[in-house]
Amino acid sequence: MIGVRSEAPVFPPVENLTAPVLLAFFKINCPTCQLTFPYLQRLADRGGPRIVGVSQDDAEDTAEFKAAFGVRFETVLDTGYPVSRAYGLEYVPSLFLVEPDGRISWRSEGFAKADLEELAGRWGVRLFDAADRVPNYKPG
């Protein structure tokens, strides 16, 4: 997987950025993605960065996943996985924060509560509520 400070491979969601964008790579049948994506939507709802889901599945399955897990942020399809390969993905979910200068400033894979809290903190967002029962880490 490409690292922090690396130049992000370019594809439409990261072209001509004026603000950071969080890329969230996923597969619909991944239990860790199913855990993570509602919290990513919460991050978006509470004033976090623009988020773009990058689906490794087809349009119909992706739409069903979004409806089932309450995901409303933009998604794009990675048919044949060229973008996933360019980012060096080994696991999903994999998350990359791409800055307007085209560099990756943060990344995470799986469900890592501390990573997500750190990311949310960049926007002054409290991501997890006291009632949330989430693991500290769940691999993808």
Q: Would you name each region that the model predicts?
A:
Residues 1-17:
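N-terminal "domain-start" segment that seeds a small globular fold
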Residues 15-35, 40:
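Short active-site neighborhood of thiol/selenol oxidoreductases, capturing the structured segment around
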Residues 68-96:
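Short, internal strand/loop/helix patches
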Residues 104-140:
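Thiol-/selenol-based redox modules, centered on thioredoxin-like
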Residues 28, 57, 78-79, 111:
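Short beta->alpha linker loops
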Residues 32-69, 83:
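Structural microenvironment flanking redox-active thiols in thiol-disulfide oxidoreductases
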